[in-house]
Design a protein with these regions (language model features):
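Conserved acetyl-CoA-binding loop-helix of GNAT-fold acetyltransferases
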Residues: 289, 295-310
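Acidic/histidine-enriched, glycine/proline-rich intrinsically disordered or flexible terminal extensions
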Residues: 354-372
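A conserved beta-strand-loop-helix scaffold within acyl/acetyltransferase catalytic domains
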Residues: 243-291
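C-terminal catalytic "cap/lid" subdomain
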Residues: 1-247, 251-252, 295
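Conserved GNAT acetyl-CoA-binding A-motif
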Residues: 310-323
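Conserved catalytic-core motifs of GNAT/GCN5-like acyltransferases
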Residues: 319-321, 332, 337-356, 360
Length: 372
């Protein structure tokens, strides 16, 4: 099969996978200062075509009428309600939830602190609608601490920054409102730049785009199961494209899925790795973590679970290989020692491409030695 066509089909599979996951979910889009609806229209049309329910909220003094008229003439209909109080907006939305158009509501906010009022009222409306996600679209890519971008900060982490007076690129009072509502209602809040493609990347790809604020979801490590196949394929595929891990077919993943260890956050797979049996030893392989969830110790927890499992299986040692210098430090930090690839299992050597510039690491687990 032509590789380009296969890549296109996998891209389509990823899109349909996420579209199916969010089908009939309610999303609320909030236009902050600097957000232009025109720049978001292609994203909104993709969401609408994916049968995601959309409500767009904006301050009534923002001018978006020309954009709505232009797209209405092109056949994309909006249900537009200008200059509504939050109470009126809720009444209309609650009464007419079955309309097929995208609802666009201008909120009349009689407050000196309009940014805070827009944040608070938008979240209250989203909660009343049972929305799954609220997207605040503005001039910033997301939250940042100096040059450090915060893709998925924990609520307690953000509270620490705010209590210490650490400068972030958002008015603290708005951020406090968001943290409180995420914890209280469980709504996922996304802070995102209002430009074409950002909503699509945030919703329909593994990468994400902005900053995601959530409550402290339950985390779990478990073994893979058949229903995980597409999630694992999407997760592993991008690491293969970058050359970080060796290619593996969907059939191979399916055949060995019970040997995959997956890390879930609120039941969604965010990281994975697999334990491959080689008789007296086992390989820790295929480490993958969604970009938003990297750097938070999840891969380490997966590795520890696999090392413990290898010890339970009475293996003499575990080993791992990587071409990535960050992974070299990762394995050394787990108590592995660098070794020659020729010192590893003969059955592993028989199927390995030694032209690959990988480095090998080994750790004894004989007699139950699993300390990391």
């Amino acid at each position: 099969m032509n590789e380009t066509i296969e890549t296109q089909m996998l891209d389509a599979l990823e899109l349909f996978h996420y579209a199916h996951r969010f089908r009939q979910h309610q999303f609320v889009l909030v236009l902050d200062d600097g957000a232009r609806l025109e720049q978001l229209m292609l994203d909104i049309r993709v969401l609408y075509s994916s049968h995601i329910k959309i409500v767009i909220l904006y301050r009534a003094d923002q001018s978006i009428g020309d954009c709505l008229d232009r797209w209405g003439q092109r056949g994309f209909r909006f249900h537009h309600l200008a200059s509504q109080s939050p109470e009126q907006a809720l009444e209309v939305l609650d009464r007419d939830r079955d309309w097929e158009e995208v609802a666009v509501i201008g909120l009349d906010l009689s407050s000196d602190q309009e940014a805070e009022a827009l944040t608070r009222q938008s979240l209250q409306i989203a909660k009343a609608l049972g929305a799954a996600k609220v997207f605040f679209l503005g001039e910033q890519k997301g939250l940042s601490l100096g040059d450090r971008f915060l893709s998925h900060p924990r609520p307690d982490e953000l509270e620490g920054y705010l209590n210490q007076g650490t400068p972030l690129n958002m008015v603290p009072s708005r951020l406090w409102i968001m943290i409180a509502e995420a914890r209280r209602s469980g709504i996922e809040i996304v802070i995102l730049e209002a430009k074409s493609g950002t909503l699509f990347e945030e919703i329909f790809t593994h990468r994400g785009s902005g900053t995601l604020l959530t409550e402290d979801y339950p985390n779990e490590i478990r073994l893979g199961r058949e229903g995980d196949l597409t999630d694992l394929l999407m997760l592993i595929r991008h690491e293969m494209q970058q050359g970080s891990i060796l290619p593996i077919s969907e059939e191979s993943i399916a055949a060995n899925i019970q040997n995959y260890f997956v890390y879930t956050v609120n039941a969604a797979i965010v990281a994975s790795a697999t334990l491959v049996d080689y008789g007296d030893s086992a390989e820790l392989a295929k480490f993958c973590t969604l970009p938003r969830y990297q750097g938070k110790g999840r891969a380490r927890q997966l590795a520890i679970q696999m090392i413990e499992r290898a010890a339970e299986l009475k293996k003499d040692y575990v080993f791992a290989l990587s071409v990535n210098p960050k992974m070299w430090d990762f394995f050394l930090g787990l108590g592995f020692e660098e070794t020659s690839r020729e010192e590893l299992s003969q059955s592993w050597q028989a199927q390995y491409d030694f032209s690959r510039p990988s480095r090998a690491f080994k750790k004894s687990v004989a007699n139950g030695k699993v300390a990391c």
